[in-house]
Amino acid sequence: MNLVGKCPPGSAALDAAADRGFDSVELHLRPSDLDDVAATAATLEQSPVSARSVHTFHARPDDPEPFRLSDALAQRLDAYLVVHSQYAQHTHTALLDSYDFAAPCGYENNPGASQFSLANLLLDRGHDLVLDTAHLFMSEPAYLESLTTLLWDYGDQIPVVHFTDSTVLEDGLAFGDGDIPLERTADVLDAHFDGAVVLEVMPDDQADARRRVLEWLD
């Protein structure tokens, strides 16, 4: 697996990601980052890291412009587009598909989306899944079994994984602040996944998360 950082596409944030040991990142977009897609892309191209993926910001699913601009940025950077919004359910996938994304893309699983629903609403319809471990932990009592099954059965449709800690109520926690069996999760990913693993914790916690994963897999 390839460990990837996460940060906004500003020069200081990108430099800091490189200082934490990352050579690639997933971009956390804010509305202002899409005011000038060419300028945002140029900032990346001049930075010490590359963009592995671009995460749409949390726009309303019936507002196509933010999604299309995110797609345009991903295209310019030759990056993967993570289609996700707190306002969109997986039942909105047909609407989002109608925006005709040109970059390779996948849909991130929402909190509460079970393995069964992800198979029915996304994977068995041919869509890629960006598998968020925290959201899966919040959705599946047999979390490790579900994680393993999804990677085993649909690995060719899961190019990006988000790895973070979580409780059943709160996600995006620093490693060790939640209840996910992190080392066992890392073992499952190491055994069944060879794509990008985005350490989706706050920037100041990413170096520690990276160190822990490397130690577990040593």
Label every PLM stretch briefly:
Residues 25-31, 106-110, 140-146, 168-170:
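Short, mixed-charge, low-aromatic patches
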Residues 3-18, 63-67, 75, 117-118, ...:
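Histidine-acidic metal/acid-base catalytic patches
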Residues 19, 45-52, 56-130, 138-139, ...:
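Active-site acidic/histidine proton-transfer and metal-coordination neighborhood
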Residues 1-57, 61:
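N-terminal pre-domain/capping segments
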